[in-house]
A protein has these predicted regions:
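RNase H catalytic domain
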Residues: 14-21, 55-117
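RNase H-like nuclease fold core
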Residues: 2-52, 57-65
Length: 117
């Protein structure tokens, strides 16, 4: 079994107007040290910013780590924890209600990063 670094990540994203200007932030904690990251876009959605917070935080990690992510986004948390996103991908990004999933490029990147860790 690998002896991986344990990293805890807290994320958040927000948007004014939805769509509208928005931003994201994350705090990564490893061995008592903290690193903050943030960013934003002029025209985005709340869900995109929630996803970007997780993606950008995971991109900071340059090696495989034992990662625990905390997010207040039901969209992100439920899609990952309930494995919906994997079903959407398997079904050519069609959800159970027969509609096309949104933010496909971001979901693909998030899946790639999760599979690395």
């Amino acid at each position: 079994m690998e002896n991986l670094k344990k990293v805890t990540i807290y994320t958040d994203g927000a948007c004014s107007g939805n769509p509208g200007p928005g931003g994201y932030g994350a705090i990564l904690i490893y061995n008592g040290k903290e690193k903050e990251i943030s960013g934003g876009e002029k025209n985005t959605t709340n869900n995109k910013m929630e996803m970007m917070a997780v993606i950008k935080a995971l991109e900071v990690l340059k090696e495989k780590c034992d990662v625990e992510v905390y997010s207040d986004s039901a969209y992100v948390v439920n899609s990952i924890n309930n494995k919906w996103v994997y079903s959407w991908k398997k079904n050519n990004w069609i959800k159970s209600d027969k509609t096309k999933a949104k933010n496909i490029e971001l979901w693909e990147e998030l899946i790639r990063l999760i599979s690395f860790h």
